[in-house]
């Protein structure tokens, strides 16, 4: 089927390709619309043209128009409405047009989620759900999710002989926490939901571990990924050797190296000629490569030293590349790689079962609460539209209703959304009615599981002439930007993007062509500002030499100075409304960054230059003093027995105690909770402070009663009113911002109360969970985006926007590789991959599947980051400025020079694939610009033909230090007075203050070591270096055991609380005779009556386990030597820091504190005994397996105990034992080994 396009009117302002996109029909249409090509205008015009054509007999409610955001949908509806009204004004008698205007409010113009919601509300009975459901926010959904997942794991632990589950726990989690398994199930659930049938994907995930019948790695479905990676690295090694040979062949080059280098090259080239059918043959070839010793140069003065070093450097790089290939792919035998996968299959099967069960339980829980979340919408709509793998009657009705389905931003569609769209459009592409608009070069939402390959598949199969399965139209003309911006973008991306690395070729169809008209000016060259962080030695010894500034600070100062310069010089900007140039304003400038980590530094730099600044930053809210104070107060209202929040409130302006007064309160009761000390102080002391404490306790009790009677927002507002805290913070510096933050807390509490969760306790837990996860809410904004300010935002946030001047900052910031180096990897094609953990041998190593998936994820990440950079560069209308810091410009430019002699336009694949930051790409691309060649005076650079205007500035960091900034400041006092501006006053103390402010402590690592630490904390820190300990249990994430409020005491005790109870009993048991069951029951009853133990703790104690200790040989020894036994022995011991932390070289000591459960102290020796409540039975296959892990877990703690006790007592610790109550096992620890 060819194109059936009516001729374009001569008066039309549309380009030929735009006209095609507006008029094409009769088949599916894919419009590949480059940045700034007017795709929204084309889409709107296509819709309006169809609607005003009465002969087409099309109503607006017969169109489905899908956009990416609600804002886009609203704008689309507004534009269509405006177009219809204009048409109606020209033809006021048209009944058809009047009907379209009337139907517009009922038209399906929305996001796909909104369309799915419409389907569900209309056909809820087909999805078997309650029609009165409420749509919840992600925060509420995550809280329900956590509860359901915790309950699921609790159920699994309670099942007897649940060996598959326990094996999974051992394989994928730490030994004391299920946090990793919790996160893994949640991660798998989210990922599976991007597939039309999550259960099928989870089942296929298991199938990838079926390797019983696989005889070679070359048969694995992901072998092409492995092959591609090895080929890429072999070619890189080959290129390194070719560079080395080039240096050896130079005049005065190390010619004696040539024979060795050529031999190396021949060995590597032999690999490329091998058959890929035999893994063993490939392994043998890689391992047999022998890099002979390079010959010694006899007369070194005859050779250019630089050429010699460069030849050696490149040869070493080639050797390293081959070594890495052998390590990554051939470190184990082929049969072992395959057997690893087969051994993991039971765990993967169990994991798949858990994810399915969780999905089922999660949905059931939401159903019981009468709620749905956003993830449910697409799958429930799919359930309604798809029956028995075919379009349902509902779907067929939609196919009849919608004459055309139009989708914007198609490149960001996922597989579920694609399936939904396919079900509501005509089946069969040759009579398709799907109109898709997008730009795969701007597909930057893979982290949201968008699938750009959907776009690419159609782009490659659809034809421009309309023949075949669909019509493809390229819109490459850019109506947004000046030629200078387009030339820069084209110059860079012609060298970066191809199908191999970026998943798309940047060819003639993809490059940007000029479509906009701007007045001529000479200031619009693209600027590359590089700041050399290598220090420049001062010319005089007494010159001010501030400490090293962070990269972000220096770059932020450079950007602030650049903006100030542009404003002061009235940089010309073309005003499209005025149709003429005008001086630049702050609102014309935007700073783009990959992430907002540098926003605080940028804000500080802007303040110094008096530049109004707005950063759309979603962090820092909980760290603000006023919010942290309110959160602490709410924690105290919920449970006053929390020392740190209570001390924070007492010290805050709400109460206003000073350090001395806090000390007086503590002295009233030195031990126990601070709240008890507060009560004692109030009742026993006569003072102004005691009166203040009495008033506070009365007020606290009133708030506690209010928290039970009233809702959360009432409590917060009452606190604001009674304490005048809201008014107080308003009087502080930044008062407007602080008050906005407190209002935001009230608003967020109000939003929380609208969820299915209620109460202060749950709200406090909710906030704690947000803080632990890092899900900060961002400080409240008092400055709007539309004001005359310089804005800073992420590149993702800028997508779809345009700005006169764009500064792309932080180009040397490393890519985020966290997902690639994660323990577990997920992939739409190959499912799940992770390390293999041999529980018996306690060994962990990567699987072949994990290595392959890591390479695939790395390639996808590189392609995505390339597209993110494309989005950043194409936001600029007139001026593009690129900024970065480099550690040493001379060395960095030398690295770029290695590809500068390449004659091909596209940079080598390995250079692009191995990039660590945007500057790696931009530097390697721009160094082939004539201006860079002129700057470096390097004849070897092969410049590329280009119209790109490039201005390169290399600055030193010293130029942005404070004393240098002063030299650039020229303040005209009279002008300031005329403009009623303040006059800067120079202080004689400025330099001294600057010296203090820029002071940097030399022993940075020592700041992470507290002067006093408990043995338990040290055990956790050392366990981080041990892969068999739980790496997630850092102290800040550990649950703290606090006395529970009475209304919570009926709940199940935590493991820590049970452990405390058991230790308390062991301390109290009489050693005068062999204890009996009756003895212990009587003792427990006495401890309960004296409130030493709670009722819940009493019930949790297992008397049989305690008796088991005293019936053991160790227990009998303790009874026999009862007069030598000491229990609950506290100690403090100064230990040299260097003995604990090898990397910290300071002559300091750290105070170690701990408590020994029991010890038998004889004349010359001591025996240590420590009690443990770890779960053993049912969790480990046998005691031998458990004993290995327990020894790993506790050896640091016991060795520290032994070292301290030996030093204090002067006696040798000759034996140390652990007694595990669960199973009544005894484990001896060797105290002679080092840490």
From Swiss-Prot:
Presence of the UniProt keyword DNA repair in the record: yes
A biological process term (GO) from this entry: double-strand break repair via homologous recombination
Binding site for ATP: 33-40
One Pfam family this sequence matches: PDDEXK_1
Domain UvrD-like helicase ATP-binding: 12-482
GO cellular component, one term: cytosol
CDD domains: DEXQc_UvrD
GO molecular-function terms, A-Z: 3'-5' DNA helicase activity; 3'-5' exonuclease activity; ATP binding; ATP hydrolysis activity; double-stranded DNA binding
EC number(s) reported in the record: 3.1.-.-, 5.6.2.4
Keywords from the UniProt entry: ATP-binding, DNA damage, DNA repair, DNA-binding, Exonuclease, Helicase, Hydrolase, Isomerase, Nuclease, Nucleotide-binding
Cofactor(s) required, per the database record: Mg(2+)
Domain of life: Bacteria
Annotated catalysed reactions: Couples ATP hydrolysis with the unwinding of duplex DNA by translocating in the 3'-5' direction; ATP + H2O = ADP + phosphate + H(+)
Residue span, UvrD-like helicase C-terminal domain: 509-800
Family to which the UniProt record says this protein belongs: Belongs to the helicase family. AddA subfamily.
Described purpose of this protein according to its UniProt entry: The heterodimer acts as both an ATP-dependent DNA helicase and an ATP-dependent, dual-direction single-stranded exonuclease. Recognizes the chi site generating a DNA molecule suitable for the initiation of homologous recombination. The AddA nuclease domain is required for chi fragment generation; this subunit has the helicase and 3' -> 5' nuclease activities.
Subunit structure: Heterodimer of AddA and AddB/RexB.
Protein name as annotated: ATP-dependent helicase/nuclease subunit A
Natural source organism: Listeria monocytogenes serotype 4b (strain F2365)
């Amino acid at each position: 089927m060819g194109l059936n396009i009516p001729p374009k009117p001569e008066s039309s302002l549309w380009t030929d390709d735009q006209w095609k996109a507006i008029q094409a029909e009769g088949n599916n249409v894919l419009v590949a619309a480059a940045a700034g090509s007017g795709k929204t205008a084309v889409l709107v015009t296509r819709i309006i043209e169809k609607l005003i054509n009465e002969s087409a007999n099309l109503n607006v409610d017969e169109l489905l128009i899908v956009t990416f955001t609600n804002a886009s949908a609203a704008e689309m509806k507004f534009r269509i409405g405006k177009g219809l009204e204009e048409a109606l004004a020209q033809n006021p008698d048209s009944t058809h047009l009047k009907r379209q205007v009337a139907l517009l409010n009922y038209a399906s113009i929305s996001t796909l989620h909104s369309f799915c919601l419409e389907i569900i509300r209309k056909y809820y009975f087909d999805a078997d759900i309650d029609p009165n459901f409420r749509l919840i926010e992600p925060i509420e959904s995550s809280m329900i999710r956590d509860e359901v997942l915790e309950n699921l794991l609790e159920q699994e632990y309670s099942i007897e002989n649940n060996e598959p589950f326990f094996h999974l726990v051992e394989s994928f989690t730490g030994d004391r926490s299920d946090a990793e398994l919790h996160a893994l199930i949640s991660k798998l659930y989210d990922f599976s939901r991007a597939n039309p049938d999550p259960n099928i994907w989870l089942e296929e995930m298991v199938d990838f571990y079926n390797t019983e019948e696989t005889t070679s790695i070359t048969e694995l479905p992901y072998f092409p990924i492995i092959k591609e990676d090895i080929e890429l690295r072999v070619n890189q090694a080959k290129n390194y050797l070719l560079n080395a040979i080039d240096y050896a062949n130079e005049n005065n080059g190390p010619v004696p190296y040539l024979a060795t280098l050529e031999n190396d090259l021949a060995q590597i080239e032999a690999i490329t000629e091998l058959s890929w059918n035999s893994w063993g043959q490939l392994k043998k070839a890689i391992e047999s490569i022998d890099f002979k010793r390079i010959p010694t140069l006899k007369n070194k003065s005859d050779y250019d030293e630089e050429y010699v070093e460069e030849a050696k450097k490149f040869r070493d790089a080639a050797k390293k590349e081959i070594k890495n290939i052998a390590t990554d792919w051939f470190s184990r035998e082929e049969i072992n790689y395959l057997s690893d996968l087969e051994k993991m299959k039971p765990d993967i099967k169990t994991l798949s079962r858990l994810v399915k069960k969780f999905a089922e339980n999660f949905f059931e829980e939401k159903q019981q609460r009468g709620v749905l979340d956003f993830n449910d919408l697409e799958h429930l709509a799919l359930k309604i539209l798809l029956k028995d793998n075919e379009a349902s009657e509902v779907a067929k009705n939609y196919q009849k209703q919608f004459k055309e389905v139009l989708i914007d931003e198609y490149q960001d569609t996922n597989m579920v959304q694609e399936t939904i769209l396919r079900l509501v459009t005509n089946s069969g592409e040759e009579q398709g009615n799907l109109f898709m608009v997008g730009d795969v070069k701007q597909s930057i939402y893979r982290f949201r599981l968008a699938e750009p390959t959907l776009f690419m598949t159609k782009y490659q199969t659809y034809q421009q002439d309309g023949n075949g399965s669909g019509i493809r139209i390229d819109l490459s003309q850019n109506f947004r930007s000046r030629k200078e911006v387009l030339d820069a973008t084209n110059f860079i991306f012609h060298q970066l993007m191809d199908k191999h690395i970026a998943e798309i070729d940047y060819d003639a169809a993809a490059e940007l062509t000029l479509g906009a008209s701007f007045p001529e000016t000479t200031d619009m060259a693209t600027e590359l500002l590089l700041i050399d962080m290598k220090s420049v030695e001062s010319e005089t010894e007494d010159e001010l030499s501030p400490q090293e500034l962070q990269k972000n600070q220096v770059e932020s100062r450079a950007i602030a100075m650049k903006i100030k310069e542009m404003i002061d010089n009235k940089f010309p900007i073309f005003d499209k409304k005025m149709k003429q140039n005008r001086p630049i304003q702050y609102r014309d400038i935007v700073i783009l960054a990959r992430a907002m980590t540098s926003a605080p530094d940028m804000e500080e730099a802007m303040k110094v230059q008096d530049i109004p600044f707005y950063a759309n930053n979603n962090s820092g809210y909980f760290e603000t003093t006023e919010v942290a104070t309110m959160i602490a107060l709410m924690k105290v209202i919920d449970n006053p027995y929390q020392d740190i929040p209570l001390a924070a409130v007492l010290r805050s302006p709400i109460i206003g105690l000073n350090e001395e007064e806090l000390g007086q309160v503590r002295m009233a009761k030195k031990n126990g909770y601070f709240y008890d000390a507060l009560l004692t102080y109030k009742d026993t002391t006569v003072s102004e402070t005691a009166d203040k404490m009495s008033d506070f306790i009365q007020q606290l009790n009133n708030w506690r009663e209010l928290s039970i009677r009233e809702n959360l927002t009432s409590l917060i507002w009452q606190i604001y009113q009674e304490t005048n805290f809201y008014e107080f913070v308003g009087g502080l510096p930044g008062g407007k911002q602080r008050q906005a933050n407190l209002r935001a807390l009230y608003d967020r509490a109000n939003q929380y109360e609208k969820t299915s969760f209620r109460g202060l306790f749950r709200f406090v837990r909710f906030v704690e969970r947000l803080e632990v996860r890092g899900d900060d809410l961002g400080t409240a904004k008092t400055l709007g985006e539309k004001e005359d300010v310089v804005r800073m935002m992420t590149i993702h946030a800028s997508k779809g926007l345009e700005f006169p001047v764009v500064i792309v900052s932080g180009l040397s910031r490393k890519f985020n590789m966290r997902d690639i180096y994660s323990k577990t990897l997920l992939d739409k094609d190959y499912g799940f991959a992770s390390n293999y953990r041999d529980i018996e041998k306690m060994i962990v190593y990567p699987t072949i599947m994990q290595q392959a998936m890591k390479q695939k994820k790395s390639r996808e990440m590189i392609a995505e980051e390339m597209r993110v950079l494309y989005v950043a560069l194409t936001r600029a209308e007139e001026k593009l400025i690129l900024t970065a810091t480099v550690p040493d410009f001379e060395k960095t430019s030398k690295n770029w020079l290695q590809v500068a002699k390449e004659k091909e336009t596209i940079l080598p694949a390995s250079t692009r694939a191995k990039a660590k930051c945007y500057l790696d790409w931009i530097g390697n691309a721009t160094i082939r610009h004539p201006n860079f060649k002129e700057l470096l005076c390097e004849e070897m650079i092969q410049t590329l033909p280009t119209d790109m205007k490039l201005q390169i500035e290399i600055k030193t960091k010293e130029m942005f230090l404070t004393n240098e900034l002063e030299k650039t400041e020229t303040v005209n006092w009279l002008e300031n007075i005329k403009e009623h501006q303040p006059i800067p006053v120079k202080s004689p103390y400025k330099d001294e203050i600057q010296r203090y402010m820029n002071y940097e402590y030399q022993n940075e690592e020592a700041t992470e070591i507290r002067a006093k630490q408990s043995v338990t904390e040290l055990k956790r820190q050392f366990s981080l270096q041990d892969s068999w300990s739980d790496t997630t249990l850092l102290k800040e994430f550990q649950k703290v055991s606090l006395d529970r409020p009475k209304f919570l005491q009926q709940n199940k005790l935590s493991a820590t609380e049970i452990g405390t109870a058991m230790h308390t009993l062991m301390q109290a048991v009489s050693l005068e005779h062999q204890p009996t069951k009756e003895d212990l029951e009587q003792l427990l009853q006495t401890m309960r009556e004296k409130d030493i133990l709670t009722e819940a703790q009493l019930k949790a104690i297992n008397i049989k386990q305690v008796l088991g200790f005293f019936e053991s040989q160790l227990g009998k020894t303790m009874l026999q030597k009862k007069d030598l036994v000491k229990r609950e022995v506290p100690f403090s011991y100064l230990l040299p820091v260097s003995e604990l932390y090898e990397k910290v070289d300071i002559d300091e000591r750290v105070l170690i504190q701990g408590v020994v459960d029991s010890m038998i102290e004889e004349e010359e020796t001591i025996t240590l005994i420590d009690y443990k409540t770890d779960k053993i039975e049912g969790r480990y296959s046998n005691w031998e397996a458990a004993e290995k892990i327990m020894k790993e877990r506790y050896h640091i703690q016991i060795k520290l105990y032994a070292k301290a006790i030996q030093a204090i007592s002067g006696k040798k610790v000759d034996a140390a034992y652990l007694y595990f109550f669960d199973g009544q096992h005894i484990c001896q620890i060797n105290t002679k080994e080092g840490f």
